[in-house]
Amino acid sequence: MEFENKEVVNRPLVSVIIPIYNVGTTIYRMIECLEQQTFQMFELILVNDGSTDESEEICKTIIRNHQNYYLYSKENQGAFSARNLGIEKANGAYLTFLDADDKIDSNYLEILFHNCMGTDIAVCDVAVYKEDTEISRFTGGNQKITQTQALNKLLVRKEINSGPCGKMFSQKIIEEVRFPFLRVYEDILFVLECFCKVREITVTDKTTYYYMQEDTGTMGRMAKSPSVDIIAATEKIMDFIADRRDLSEECTYITISHLYQYALPVAIQNNYRGCEFILKTQILYRKYMEQILKCKAMPWKEKVIFYLYAHGYVYTNKFIKKIQR
C-alpha cells in the first residue's frame, strides 16, 4: 500500500530512506533533524515495515506537512526489505539511509552530497551514544581512500562503521545492489558490495551521524539471543576475504573474533549444552580452520581457543569445558 503526498515533478538530488518499525514518536527526533538541514533538495522515503503500534498514523501526519515526504507500507519482513523497497522507490541521484531513532548534524546531507559527487560514495563520522554519553566514534579524517583501504577499514571495524548509515551512495552504483535476505548483518554485506563497485571513497569528519544505542534495540536483543544469520553473514565475509589477496590479515582475525563474541556467551548461558547457534558456529570454524591457523594477525592463544571451540570445547576462566550434545 502506498501513501504519497504529491507526484514527483522534479527529480530530487538526494533520496533519504528510513525504515519504520514500531518507532512511535521517536521518529519526530529524526524528522526535526531533516527539517533543520542546510541542504533541502531531497525527498524522504518512509517505509513502514508492518508496524503494530501507532507508527504508520504518525508517519501519515508527518507527510501531510511536507511535499517532498512519502510513505510506503508493507508487511513485516525486516529492515533489509524496507530499505530495498526504499531503493526501488527512490528518485534521487544519490541515496542515504537513516534510522528513525537516531540523529544527524544539520549539515549532514550537504557535506555528504558534496563529498559524494567526486567518488560515488562518501562516508562520515559515526558517534555511538548510550544514555546521552558518547561511548565510541568511527572517524577517518578528511581524505580519499582506495577501495582496498576502505574494505580494510570496514572489515576491521575501524574508522568506517559497518552499517549503511553515515554514508551516501550514488544511484548508479547502488542500482543493482540490494540488502540480502537476512535479519541481521545484512548491512555490512550491502556496504561491502557497494564498496567493491568504486575505485575510491571520500571520507569526511565535517559532519556526524549519531547512533543512539539502546539495549532494547536489534543489537541489544541479538547479544542475548543471536540469530544464525550472523553465522551466514560471517561465512560470506570469510569467502570474500579469501578471494581478496589485497586485504589485511586483520580482516580474518576480526571477523572470526567477532563471531566468537556471540558464541561464547551462548555456550555459557546454555550451561555448555549444544544448540543450533553453537553447532553452526563450530561447523564454520572447522571450515575456515586453515585460514585461522595461517592468519598472522591472530595471536596463537586465540587460535587455540577457536580450535578448541571448533572441536567441542570452551576455554573460559582458565578452564576447558566440553560442550555437551
Set out the residue ranges of the language-model regions:
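Short beta-strand/loop segment that forms part of the nucleotide-sugar
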Residues: F42-G50, Y70-E75, A100
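Short aromatic/hydrophobic "clamp" motif used to bind/position activated sugar donors
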Residues: L95
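Catalytic core of nucleotide-sugar-dependent glycosyltransferases
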Residues: T208-E214, G220-L247, Q261-M289
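Glycine-rich, basic loop-to-helix element that forms the pyrophosphate-binding segment
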Residues: K74-A90
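Donor-binding/catalytic cores of nucleotide-activated saccharide
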Residues: A79-F80, A100-T202, Y211-P226, P299
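Membrane-interface aromatic/basic loop that binds lipid-linked glycans or pyrophosphate carriers
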Residues: E2, N271-R325
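Short, well-formed alpha-helical segments that are part of the catalytic scaffolds
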Residues: N22-Q36
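A conserved acidic beta->alpha catalytic loop
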Residues: C33, N48-I58
